Every structure is written in C-alpha cells, then in structure tokens.
Amino acid sequence: SARWMTTGLGVYELYVNGKLIGEEILKPGFTHPYKTKRSFTYEVSNALSKQAGAENVFAVQVTPGWWADKIITYSGQQGMVGTKVAFRGVLELTYADGSKAYLGSNTSDWKAGIAGPVKHAAIFDGEEYDARELPGYDTLDKLSTPEKNTEFEGEILPSNGGEVYFREDLALSPQKAYLWK
C-alpha cells in the first residue's frame, strides 16, 4: 500500500500520475500562521502504476494562500506571513511482507518550477489562469532543484475535520444575462 502524508505553506493541490488526490479545496486551511499547520494523509495505492519499471509522478501545485499573500496580520496591519510557498510530503510504502519504506520531499530528489498556467493565485485577489500555456510546463526539463524553506517553525498537526469541499449542489446557475451600462 502507499500513503502520502502532506502539508504546505500556501494552498496546495496534489496529483499522482496526473490524477487529483483528495476532495478538499484550499488545503491546508487557515491556522495560526506562526504556530500550526495541518497535515493530510491520503491512500494513493490505486493511483500508482504497479508494472515493473513503471515511473510514478507525484506533483503538487502550491499557491500563496494565507501564507505569502496579502492578509490582515494579527497586529491589524496588511502584510504577509511568509515570503515563499513550500510543500512537505512523505510517501509511506508498505510491502507485502509488512516492511515499510519512507520517501520524503527534499532538495535532491524532487524538482520544482514556477512555470504553468496559474500565473497568480490569492485568497482575496482570485486566480489568474493563462489558458494559452502550452503542455509540457511540468516536464523534468522545465523544472529545477527546489529551495529549502525554513520560515515556519511551528507544529504540524493532523487535519481535524474542518476542511472546505466543493459542493456542486450549491453551485449557482445564471438565470439571465444582461449588459449593464
């Protein structure tokens, strides 16, 4: 089996072999920026390619969210908590004999990049998405070695059930459109 334990500085989405993992949106949610971050654990065995010699791609898209974007700070001033987004993940593999192996995100085996169709994403300012972006922005030749982020010194705690989910049954449908002059 395979479990992926994750957290981030900023809002993130997870993908395994191109498949979105998890139903929550705005992960890891809003917490005290200096004291706690929430972690999420996913069973990802079904998303893995298990053929001999197969390559599995674990990808994460991280945007500033409440971490590195405009917010109102605890002092009441507009500011940012951190300056750079970050991600931490650990993959736990359990083999047929019960033994386990752990593979963690790091600056030697993982790749990172800032290219892609999402040019800016913020909690209050929305998202800027460039649909003209050509495929291949997430290929290894476009990515580089990630930087280590040491801005957060708080505690990482498991998710406590206060997540946000997209609910299609609550989506609004336009009834009429008009031009306002």
Where would I find each of the regions flagged by the language model?
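Activation corresponds to long, low-complexity, non-globular regions
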Residues: 100-181
